[in-house]
């Protein structure tokens, strides 16, 4: 069973909104004042968007492949896929870019499908290292290519707006599978294509 599609049906919209009111009171606010009357509803609706990935199975996006280009066997790279996620430790935003590459083995998908896989995993509570591995594993398991490379750059609000308060800092993680891990030339070609760090991510 794909647990990513499960929702907690026992929690109602009203209960979720009341939880927001509780947090507002805890912060020292009055949720009944005019400016905050609609805030609980808006927050719950925003959460429905931010965490819509739990209602999807990313593997589904990679099921349809292009038969007419199944003979293509050179590297395919999609770079600078922007994403927004949330840190599972502080529920703070993570904003950045994902770069994906693979060496097809008879299965080629539309490039938008790779971006949808990224979105599906990003729209959940995440740790960047875990998300990197999840995207790579999804592509490897579904398309069975000769190799997969995933590199993620992310600026973490839990570091820039609290705690150490360091702006302009970005985190880079990578996951290499198959030929991307075993062949230094393949890995170098991929990294040259994506040019990590050429654009500063600020949060």
UniProtKB/Swiss-Prot annotation:
The keyword Isomerase does not apply. InterPro entries: GTP-CH-I_C/QueF, GTP-CH-I_N, GTP_CycHdrlase_I, GTP_CycHdrlase_I_CS, GTP_CycHdrlase_I_dom. It is an enzyme of class 3 (hydrolase). One of its GO terms (cellular component) is cytoplasm. Its EC number is 3.5.4.16. It catalyses: GTP + H2O = 7,8-dihydroneopterin 3'-triphosphate + formate + H(+). Zn(2+) binds at residues 87, 90, 158. Keywords: GTP-binding, Hydrolase, Metal-binding, Nucleotide-binding, One-carbon metabolism, Zinc. Pathway: Cofactor biosynthesis; 7,8-dihydroneopterin triphosphate biosynthesis; 7,8-dihydroneopterin triphosphate from GTP: step 1/1. One of its GO terms (biological process) is tetrahydrofolate biosynthetic process. It holds the Pfam family GTP_cyclohydroI. GO terms for molecular function: GTP binding; GTP cyclohydrolase I activity; zinc ion binding. Coiled coil: none annotated. Belongs to the GTP cyclohydrolase I family. PANTHER family: GTP CYCLOHYDROLASE 1, GTP CYCLOHYDROLASE I. Toroid-shaped homodecamer, composed of two pentamers of five dimers. NCBIfam families: folE, PRK09347.1-2, PRK09347.1-3. This is GTP cyclohydrolase 1.
